[in-house]
Amino acid sequence: MDLDLLDLNPRIIAAIKKAKLKSVKEVLHFSGPDLKRLTNLSSPEVWHLLRTASLHLRGSSILTALQLHQQKERFPTQHQRLSLGCPVLDALLRGGLPLDGITELAGRSSAGKTQLALQLCLAVQFPRQHGGLEAGAVYICTEDAFPHKRLQQLMAQQPRLRTDVPGELLQKLRFGSQIFIEHVADVDTLLECVNKKVPVLLSRGMARLVVIDSVAAPFRCEFDSQASAPRARHLQSLGATLRELSSAFQSPVLCINQVTEAMEEQGAAHGPLGFWDERVSPALGITWANQLLVRLLADRLREEEAALGCPARTLRVLSAPHLPPSSCSYTISAEGVRGTPGTQSH
């Protein structure tokens, strides 16, 4: 019994045992007034008991935040990431997607959001030493049909994309049988899916990645500008459920989002082109933004801008508690999504 290890007056220890409290942790489950009533100890004695119990569980060492960060082996899940399948993109995100929390990937049409989501569905199936989680993925479609042909192409091209993985291991992986696809058409069906179907797959260890493509589509279809309150409630419910699932099963959640565009006239003082400049921002507003851990933006330039020599596609870190605002360019080929070396900027 660890109660005997506490540096307390034997009379206090006896009072604790008489109250049928069996451990230090059990003592800390009660408030001061409750302990006073259970043990018949005085207020100073109860305060001393709680302080001693707290110090006993905490231990004597005091660690700084830097020391905690450096001792990764003591907190493995806090530092583990899901690789994106590309060393350049992983470097941008310091290893990949965090396991606990929602990552949003917003961007224009044809920016490559779905391509990256499919690549993650394959990456999650690799062993941990190769950046995966040794499990499958749940892919929830809310807009278009699932891109089966593109997935088959990516599966066939894995040996060319993942040159870091031995060929015999690639041959053993059965990528297609580890991706569980759901199609939902409205908000209620989406909420039912994440509340009932997704937890079953996660709890059985069949999946460790949840993808929603896209989160904005059902909300934009069902709720107009006059229905902001019910939309906010449903967004909060969805976000809370996804965060709870991610935390409980240490499974990253990737939500693809649409963007809104604001037009600004760009003159000579603002740039060399003299046309209307589009400023994009993720859809769904502040209610949804508050549910997120990481917010990424996949940006695809227009032909006029790309003609000036700018990178055609850029992945930006808009916000994250562990990442600075940064970006890198990337390309999409038959093999998948690759970051361009030497293009990362802060």
Curated annotation (Swiss-Prot):
This is DNA repair protein XRCC3. It is linked to Breast cancer: A common malignancy originating from breast epithelial tissue. Breast neoplasms can be distinguished by their histologic pattern. Invasive ductal carcinoma is by far the most common type. Breast cancer is etiologically and genetically heterogeneous. Important genetic factors have been indicated by familial occurrence and bilateral involvement. Mutations at more than one locus can be involved in different families or even in the same case. Melanoma, cutaneous malignant 6: A malignant neoplasm of melanocytes, arising de novo or from a pre-existing benign nevus, which occurs most often in the skin but may also involve other sites. The lineage of its organism: Eukaryota, Metazoa, Chordata, Craniata, Vertebrata. The gene is XRCC3. GO terms for biological process: DNA damage response; DNA recombination; DNA repair; double-strand break repair via homologous recombination; double-strand break repair via synthesis-dependent strand annealing; interstrand cross-link repair; positive regulation of mitotic cell cycle spindle assembly checkpoint; regulation of centrosome duplication. PANTHER family: DNA REPAIR PROTEIN XRCC3. Coiled coil: none annotated. The modification N-acetylmethionine is found at M1. Its main location: nucleus. It comes from Homo sapiens (Human). Involved in the homologous recombination repair (HRR) pathway of double-stranded DNA, thought to repair chromosomal fragmentation, translocations and deletions. Part of the RAD51 paralog protein complex CX3 which acts in the BRCA1-BRCA2-dependent HR pathway. Upon DNA damage, CX3 acts downstream of RAD51 recruitment; the complex binds predominantly to the intersection of the four duplex arms of the Holliday junction (HJ) and to junctions of replication forks. ATP binds at G107, R108, S109, S110, A111, G112, K113, T114. The keyword Cytoplasm applies.
